[in-house]
Amino acid sequence: YFIENSNEEELIILLKKYIYDDLIRQFEDMLNSRRLQLHISENANDKFIELIDKISYTQILTLCNRVAVFFSDKVLTGNMSKSMAKNAALLNVSKFYDRAIQSDWTINHAEICHIGKELQFFIERILNKKTTILKDIASAENLRKWKNLEKDYNRQTAYAEE
């Protein structure tokens, strides 16, 4: 009912909100496992949100992991304080992205393992999709593509049954 009465923009806004919430939670977990904390400044948060329009959830997760490891190594070697790492971690996710683009590097996709319940529910129950859509950028264009893929799959299944 919800998906039938919502337009694409509303669905994408909600999907991006759930993606953002889940990525922040996972990034905090990555940092906490390395005895670091996350401070979310307005500027860093805005840049992080912009990434959701540029690359996929799984690619952002890869960048978050790289930043967590990098900052953990810096703190362990004494090249950075914990408070500096706390304040700079989120902004550095977008800086790592910028560096990757400038250097023409490919950003790999992280494994989809521990998706938050809210994000998983929204994708599987509201959008009626598989969580593998997280390998694509959350956009209205991709939402239409996912719908068309489902129609094509249903058509192929109908032909196979005949």
Where are these regions (language model features)?
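Basic, alpha-helical nucleic-acid-binding regions used in initiation and control of genome expression
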Residues: 1-162
